[in-house]
Design a protein with these regions (language model features):
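Arg/Lys-enriched, amphipathic patches
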Residues: 1-110, 120, 124-125, 153-156, ...
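Surface-exposed loop/turn segments and immediately adjacent short secondary-structure elements
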Residues: 70-72, 76-232, 238, 246, ...
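Conserved catalytic palm subdomain of right-hand nucleotidyl-transferase polymerases, strongest
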Residues: 100, 174-181, 230-239, 280-324
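Conserved pre-motif C helix in the palm subdomain of viral-like polymerases
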Residues: 232-263, 281-287, 308, 331, ...
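Catalytic palm subdomain of template-directed nucleic-acid polymerases
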Residues: 309-326, 362-363, 414-438, 453-462, ...
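Short, conserved micro-motifs composed of acidic
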Residues: 399, 447-474
């Protein structure tokens, strides 16, 4: 009878296996050198070939180890260069080291334990439950979009073939989760561990039985800028274990099939057949039209929103209510909420895990399913804006007389809104933002948000709008989805960001 597969034993086995020892390599190199200089006998020749093969095998393992550590894919087919991989891994490690941060009292701390305490307190507060205000008001009159045919897709039973296909779609050497194993192990030894993996995954997907240990996650902190000083300057990225990634990916593949029928065309992120360039082109043409509008009494404005920690602030009750209102099957909703709400995680600081945080709100960044769930939440924001447009409270911007009026463009959490520059429409935008923020948990950072006015708007008329919105006025948005929004005569200045990005890679 085959012995049951144990994750604890597997973890212990992985921990005992380290990268090739430098001392062993030196001994083999010395042995090969001595044999090459020795008398040319058949016995010496056999020993020389055996030692050379052993040395080559160890050097190959060392190269693979450092290639995985360095996370470099663009030299995959190049010459062997272990020293390069080693230097890249060391460079990444130095860049990702946290040498100090400022705590809530603005005091600089540089001891690892103190940094860990600051990080733990910050994320415990960030992922704690806030009040769920005005949810019913926000979700009222929300029509079911999930048809009976669409319901059949997430409701049908899952299969072993589906699970295996998802595993082999994963990048084999992507960053491992808390159990220190990436997808390559499961792909390589599928004939050994496959049945056990399938049993665990199907037990949850088909019956809802969740092993909470599977949902333990490491959070790594990626700096947003060159000189991060506060925890808000770091982006938390989840490193889940492979079993849980399989569960999420299988469910995401089902949801992806019906997503285009649920998400508004103004949202281009992660939806099949939609491109980021669609939003870029529409935004560029709309802003260019506003820039060229020199005459007329009616002005227009574009509002670029900065949403603070968009994924981390999503309220679970809001997400659950959204799915019920859209008409998803109850069993599917229970599986999703089980994935979302059974999470626990530790923060990795300089290679070591600290704390055991159990959140009560927020969605993890890095999970494919949660990307789609965030779009379902953002759908309500789109619906509120569309309803305001249909009721005549919001008119947006039109490029020409018969062109459709554009009120908003969304890409993930990147939002660009358009309206007429008058008191009524500005108030409508403000009310909509307040309603959506209160019910969903989203926090609009008005200090980092900005507004751009059409050229026919006089400066004196802009002041009231700026005061009502509480944002800064700009001559042009610096960029939208990584590309310039307006291109004038100063081409060098406009495209200087391309040069900067190239230099960062060199």
């Amino acid at each position: 009878m085959r012995r049951a597969f144990k994750f604890e034993e597997l973890l212990a086995w992985v921990s005992s296996k380290t990268h090739p020892d430098a001392e062993t390599i030196k001994k083999l190199q010395k042995q090969v050198e001595e044999l090459s200089m020795a008398e040319q006998t058949e016995e010496n020749r056999t020993e020389f070939l055996a030692a050379s093969k052993k040395l080559d095998d160890i050097l190959l393992k060392q190269e693979i180890y450092w290639a995985q550590r360095s996370q470099i894919a663009w030299l995959k087919h190049g010459d062997k260069n272990t020293k390069f991989f080693h230097s890249k891994a060391s460079q990444r490690q130095r860049r990702n080291m946290i040498h100090g941060v400022r705590d809530q009292q603005n005091i600089w701390v540089d001891e690892v334990e103190d940094i860990a305490n600051v990080a733990t307190n910050y994320f415990e507060n960030l992922f704690s439950l806030g009040s769920c205000d005005r949810m019913e008001e926000c979700l009222e009159a929300m029509q079911h979009k999930v048809t009976p045919d669409m319901k059949e897709i997430p409701s049908r039973d899952y299969s072993a073939e589906e699970i295996k296909a998802v595993l082999f779609q994963m990048g084999p050497t992507k960053a491992p989760g808390p159990y220190s194993m990436n997808a390559l192990f499961y792909q390589k030894f599928w004939h050994i561990v496959g049945d056990d993996v399938i049993a665990v995954v199907l037990d949850f997907l088909n019956s809802g039985n969740m092993n909470f240990e599977l949902n333990y996650t490491n959070i790594v902190l990626i700096p947003k800028n060159k000189s991060p000083e506060r925890m808000s300057d770091y982006r938390p990225i989840s490193l889940c274990n492979i079993i849980y990634k399989i569960i999420f990916k299988v469910m995401a593949n089902r949801l992806k099939q019906i997503l285009p029928n649920l998400i508004s065309p103004t949202q281009s992120a992660f939806v099949p057949s939609r491109l980021i360039t669609d939003n870029v082109l529409v935004a560029y043409e709309t802003l260019h039209s506003m820039h060229c509008k020199k005459k007329g009494k009616k002005g227009a404005l574009g509002l670029k929103l900065d949403i603070n920690k968009a994924y981390d602030r999503v309220k679970w009750a809001f997400l659950e209510k959204i799915m019920y209102n859209l008409g998803f099957p109850e069993a599917w909703i229970e599986r999703v909420m089980s994935c979302v709400s059974t999470l626990s995680f530790s923060i990795r600081i300089n290679g070591k895990a600290y704390g055991n945080i159990i959140p009560t709100t927020g969605l993890r960044q890095g999970d494919p399913l949660l990307l789609y769930l965030f779009l379902l939440c953002a759908k309500r924001f789109t619906t509120l804006l569309t309803r305001a447009k249909e009721e005549g409270r919001l008119h947006g911007v039109s490029l020409c007389r018969r062109a459709p009026r554009i009120t908003h463009l969304l890409f993930d959490d990147d939002s660009l809104l358009f309206c007429q520059a008058n008191q009524e429409e500005v108030q409508c935008i403000t009310d909509t933002l307040q309603l959506y923020a209160a019910s969903s948990g989203q926090c609009i950072n008005f200090e980092k948000s900005s507004v751009y006015f059409s050229s026919n708007m006089e400066v004196a008329h802009r002041e009231g709008t700026i005061a009502a919105l509480g944002v800064k006025d700009v001559e042009s948005f610096e960029s939208y989805l990584g590309l310039p929004t307006l291109i004038g005569w100063a081409k060098y200045q406009t495209f200087s960001f391309l040069k900067d990005q190239v230099w960062k890679k060199i």
